């Protein structure tokens, strides 16, 4: 009987995962959030829901749109924790940031979109410009390569420059994201054996 209970407990614990979302940090200026938003939208995030008539357009402010964009980017990168850094302007959360009418994806499959992404410029855009078309994997919203400042490189332990320079699309490695689940399963198994 004990082996059966242990087996069922192990299956129960191994099957439990908690969803993760990425959101912009509080206390940052709108200009910093706008740069983060532009980067995420210009590098593969599905920002269409934040456009006028989109399900996540309201509230129409930089923070809300930034939250949706960085989460979309994070989900498209397979929830790799380093893809939610944006040089310190975003953070991981286990609290669902969705609100009435706007569902934030909690997995890569829930973050749809392919091909080109249309990015709505910020308030400081030249008059007459309605949108900028960028393509996944390229076309950074910045001119040139930043070298200093909040969004620049110039970090001694980084391997690249920009908001998220160390993200790797390498998927052959193994990462243990929910180590506390493994520890809890091991502890429960040990208790069951005694």
UniProtKB/Swiss-Prot annotation:
Bias (Low complexity): 106-116
GO molecular function list: (1->3)-beta-D-glucan binding; polysaccharide binding
Annotated localization: Cell membrane; Cell junction, Plasmodesma
GPI-anchor amidated serine lipid sites: 171
Cystine pairings recorded for this chain: 22-84
Ranges of compositional bias, category Polar residues: 117-140
Propeptide feature ranges: 172-194
Protein name: PLASMODESMATA CALLOSE-BINDING PROTEIN 2
Originating organism: Arabidopsis thaliana
GO-annotated cellular components: plasma membrane; plasmodesma; side of membrane
Gene that this sequence comes from: PDCB2
Keywords from the UniProt entry: Cell junction, Cell membrane, Disulfide bond, Glycoprotein, GPI-anchor, Lipoprotein, Membrane, Signal
